[in-house]
UniProtKB/Swiss-Prot annotation:
It comes from Thiobacillus denitrificans (strain ATCC 25259 / T1). Pfam families: PrmA. The gene is prmA. One of its GO terms (biological process) is methylation. This is Ribosomal protein L11 methyltransferase. Its EC number is 2.1.1.-. Methylates ribosomal protein L11.
Amino acid sequence: MPWQSVRILVDSVQAEPLSDALMEAGALSVSLEDADAGTVDETPLFGEPDHPSAELWPHSIAVVLLEADADVAETLRAAAAQAGVAAPLDYTVETVAEQDWVRLTQSQFDPIPISARLWIVPTWHEAPDSRALNLKLDPGLAFGTGSHPTTRLCLRWLDANLRGGETLLDYGCGSGILAIAAAKLGARRVEGVDIDPQAVSASRDNAALNEVDAHFGLPGELAAGEYDVVVANILTNPLKAMAPLLAGRVRSGGSLVLSGILAEQAEDVMAVYRPWFVFDAPASDEGWVRLVGVKR
């Protein structure tokens, strides 16, 4: 059965309420794109997968998928009325041939090489190198995967620096990918915490999928103690606020690995942590940085 793809020009005020209302009105999917993409007015937005950006583009295109027999004008009118915005007038409609959407989505994600020996492999793919350390994880998970520069930066540090036998804490574990990688790289004891119970559940499932011994829970469930390595791939403001907490979890001589930080934010973050840590030069990837400090 074919579908109708409707592209609607919306502003930042309309975008989210209209998108929600369209889903309730029967849309099969709604996604937002920058209407100014590819022009001098393009607005880049940055966000880690488990902490998406709260910003919206000044002008967006809402791409709406409707069933073939849906009344487009009536659907838009009803959704706009529910959202409390003016009914959109600037839109186009095209017919989209039926496709196997699951197969199409899967075809867009290939295994991700992190280093010479470390790969992230979607569960539906064969590992390109069966001798490598292959992390089984599906791109598109709500809690983050190795497709984001901050995650890659942290994974590369773990791959280059873990020698085996370490204790490691992943603070803000999301999908558990960093903790799982640490376990595969030989860390002796690996723990992860997240404030979101669903992230904790996802991390446990992913650890089981990868057949590693890593323990996950909420922050209040974490026992007292210090670690050889603490990694936190979250965002700048939470990292700054949690400086005393994270510093207290790293043993003297141990390493703190921070990411989720834009390049222009790096100095501010290091300044907050310098009472406890001596930092290496930041490593960067696509405008994001990784900071590594050694505890005094």
